[in-house]
Amino acid sequence: MVNHQDETRTAYDGVVELYASLFANRLETQPFSRTMIGTFAELVRATGNPRAADVGCGPGHLTAMLHELGLDAFGLDLAPGMIDHARQAHPALRFQEARMESLPIEDAALGGVLAHYSMIHTPPGELPELLAEQARVLAPDGLLLVSFFGTDEQEPVRFDHKVAPAYSWPADRLAELLADAGLVPFARLLHDPASERGFLDAHLLARRS
């Protein structure tokens, strides 16, 4: 039986070039995302530990952005095709194939973790495990920025994403899961992307307790 990780990896490996071309400059039209990522980078630098992981890095464009913002950033992704593309596009940066629930990082090693829409394909019942893993690799006071599709519903909503099945989350519910994992949410941003998806673009910033 094919699990959701295998399905997601295969699906993204099949759209590497298309995905990279669509998202390479996407943040130029997303000022809210740029602001949250910039704030995240500033706060990570302030911890004195600039080492940061871009989990679910895809073609590596946000890893490069974090590097430009002064972080010692590296990228991790489930899809080997995405990692190959990222290495070719950004040869000076480090990229490695990895699963988000089993990161190849020592305990308390990072000042920051960026998860930019990279947890959206995880079934709700498995998300606590993923969040606990992000908490494990963060040093005390380290930062996690999670970006996701938000919903006004009370529970996560499954929908047919163009690449693989995905879930939108109520921000309050996801904040509770972050807190349960030892990650204290202290800032959030939700906005309407003026699209026909029917979801909010949502961002939660949390600090490792």
Would you name each region that the model predicts?
Residues 128-140:
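A short glycine-rich, Lys/Arg-flanked "PGG" loop and its adjoining helix->strand segment in the class I
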Residues 51-102:
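Class I SAM-dependent methyltransferase SAM/SAH-binding core
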Residues 101-113:
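A short acidic, Gly/Pro-enriched loop at the edge of an enzyme's catalytic core
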Residues 157-173:
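Acceptor-substrate binding/catalytic loop of class I
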Residues 141-148:
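Conserved beta-strand signature within the Rossmann-like core of class I S-adenosyl-L-methionine
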Residues 1-47, 152:
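Conserved class I S-adenosyl-L-methionine
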Residues 112-126:
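A short SAM/SAH-binding and catalytic strip from SAM-dependent methyltransferases
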Residues 194-209:
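Core SAM-dependent methyltransferase catalytic element
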